[in-house]
Amino acid sequence: MEKITSFTIDHIKLQPGLYVSRKDHIGAETVTTFDLRLTKPNDEPVMNTAEVHTIEHLAATYLRNEPNWREKVVYFGPMGCRTGFYLLLAGDYSSREVLPLVTACFRFIRDYRDAVPGASPKDCGNYLDMNLSMANYWGAKYVGVLENADETRLNYPE
């Protein structure tokens, strides 16, 4: 079998950033998959499931309520390696074009202090696995990366 695209990225050189992972064409529509990399793979500790789960709930809620992007959001969810998240948007976009959206989303996560949306037994299959304070921490850490993002944090390393 061929190696999938995400396994061809040099994870030794990869830094936290916002990257275009792939672009898929479905009929006339393009779907852009973004790699929201919060930790340096194989170097920094990965995120625990509780904060990953909390970030997932907060980001999905924010993105699906953001007036300019809500109709373009296909999916937001965690990477299995727990070093980041994937954001899928309907449309052909660059990292630079979605940088304001992703930055605003993670500022929301950084500053959020209320009950986590969907964190109830009726709404979620694992509602107790949440950690808002660590989600706030990771939100702040990633905002720092995004606010200072240059091309090395917006394009995969060669």
Each language-model region and where it sits:
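Active-site-adjacent, His/Asp/Glu-enriched structural segments that form or flank metal-binding
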Residues: 76-148
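Arginine residue identity/basic-tract feature
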Residues: 22, 37, 64, 70, ...
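Histidine-acidic residue clusters that define the catalytic metal-binding segment
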Residues: 144-158
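M16/MPP (pitrilysin/insulinase) zinc-metallopeptidase core fold and M16-derived inactive scaffolds
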Residues: 41, 45-97
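His/Glu-rich zincin catalytic helix
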Residues: 1-63
